[in-house]
Amino acid sequence: MLIWKQSNGIFGKENIMQKKGHFWKVLSCILITVFFIPSAVVAGDKVYKMKAESVYGPMSKTTTEGLFRFLDLVEEKSQGKIRFQRFSSGSLAKAKEALDALEVGMFDVLLSYPSYYAGHVPEGQIFLIPYLFKSMKAIYDLWYNTEVGTMVSETFREKGSVILGPQFLASNVVATRKQISTLDGFKGLKIRAPGGVGSKTVETMGAVPVMLVGAEIYTALQRGTIDGYVYPLYSTWDYKFYEQAKFIVQPSLGYIITFIWMNKRTFDGLPSDLQKILMDAGKEHAAYLLDWAQKSDEKIWGQLATKGVKPVTLSEPDVNNLVENLKARVWPTYNQNARCKKILDICIKHEGWE
């Protein structure tokens, strides 16, 4: 009996162990069902893989803060349903051809500067107009709270691209190799300009515009090919332009506003919820960059001071003279069609220039 009981006990323990093993198997199945089936469902959703390019270098703040941070935001908000392969330095298409390349479908997303495409979409030049806008906040307000954003966006849609949002990056400054204390001092100087309105601005100042991409500026300064440049304030620090040009003219010409575009066919092919995510992310990112750019300008001025860079402020009569000349010669050049004129009129009224 004892042996049987022991034997029965052993068999009973094995039976209990078998039941426990079965229990854990069932529990494991339940846990797998709870935790992994939703992932399988997500994995079964369509993932939209896109190519995104910045025409600027991989370490440029225009690329890292302007584009890559936006791409991160979209990937997060879409829960991975939109994913980006990232390119920079114009590796998919050079700056001046990049918008055309985007619109024919060579890639899906582009960050670039609208002045490169002045002949393609003149309406996109509005934020390049010098001295028109009194703050970056004013530009944000014009884009999202007036007809300006809608009208500019419509023009690009007609060409085959969708603006996902404006990018606020920095003050737009003129820096020179030698100190220029008066407006007359610009006469005959060769100043790098981005084209379009930027080139007309340089001409109005009495200088000669030279069209160069950002990567060529340092060497051109070093060789004396140019005497100065129009470019974002932060570039003077980031690209060490202060080694060649230590004088920054004040007040600034305006502000650097780039756009992020998406190929229209790509955008139209997305579900409505993902389209909304893209546009919402664009507005959120614009608000972030507005704050970031203002703080960045303050920080950069402090850093440049340690390298001997000096702001050179034009006299009030020179500034007034320059503004009047710009209003007469440059601002009206934006009015290439009725839509341009309406956009400019809204901006002039908004900024109190009437």
Question: Which residues does each predicted region cover?
Answer:
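N-terminal secretory/targeting leader peptides
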Residues: 13, 44-139, 147-148, 154-354
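Short, low-complexity disordered leader/linker segments with a strong preference
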Residues: 1-49, 354
